[in-house]
């Protein structure tokens, strides 16, 4: 099967009915890996505070870690952004972090974001850290919140840094939200797709479909024209050793080993966060080193699902 998309049709001639299924061939996905991070906003405040003292945005320790992952192991890094850090968020930090939003972020590092956009991308995640904000949303609401994040990314990082892939907050979204994201230019969304869980992080997929995607790298919902990618390991959920074992299991799978996606959340990087992970650095570098040594190469999810 050489075509990017092949449509299979089964017809019951006696009943006059038919079923259709589309099969996608994704040669650019094979052997690729990506690391993404959700809930990002705090590093942008740090850049803003230090806009007159940092000579490079990679003087920010969080971004410096991802640059190390890229320079040593060729990682492609994707950061999903909140629009605002709110009063509610402050309770999870022991230091007095101020409220702020993306409209106040400096554009002093715009050219550096643009220059590094071949390996570092940004996208919309949610307006703020609220529970499942798009599970029962409207197209108008999510479009408005998405556009607010896009507007600021374009202002402080440039169009080169804006990705057409995201993970929505909590990976929960109704069909209206998915259609709105497709209309906003998004081509793919990542999730956990874990069957049998109250929160499977699977957007609006049925339990049957969740079980199907769980054993695969990608699924394309042809009704909404949206690809969904399976996240193979959430690096802040288990021990680093368990993460590596989980990644090794995915890599060895004939149906999941073609493309590996690992993900973490920004807040676990900071010592003042209530659930701070002192080994955050190892949780980022060890998986990407493992994948690189296994022969995988950094590849954005958008490149993995592209045609041609």
Predicted regions, residues:
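Exposed beta-strand face motif in extracellular beta-rich ectodomains
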Residues: 2-6
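Active-site-adjacent pocket scaffolds in enzyme catalytic domains
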Residues: 56, 89-101, 160-161, 167-266
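C-terminal domain-boundary segment and adjacent tail
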Residues: 189-193, 264-308
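Metal-dependent polysaccharide deacetylase catalytic core of the NodB/CE4 family, i.e.
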Residues: 76-174, 196-200, 266-270
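Well-ordered, non-membrane alpha-helical segments in soluble/globular domains
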Residues: 51-66, 95-109, 139-152, 240-249, ...
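Loop/turn elements at helix/coil->beta-strand transitions in domains of secreted/extracellular proteins
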Residues: 30-31, 71-78, 115-121, 159-164, ...
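Conserved structural position at the C-terminal beta-strand
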Residues: 10-12
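Active-site beta->alpha N-cap acidic-glycine motif
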Residues: 16-111
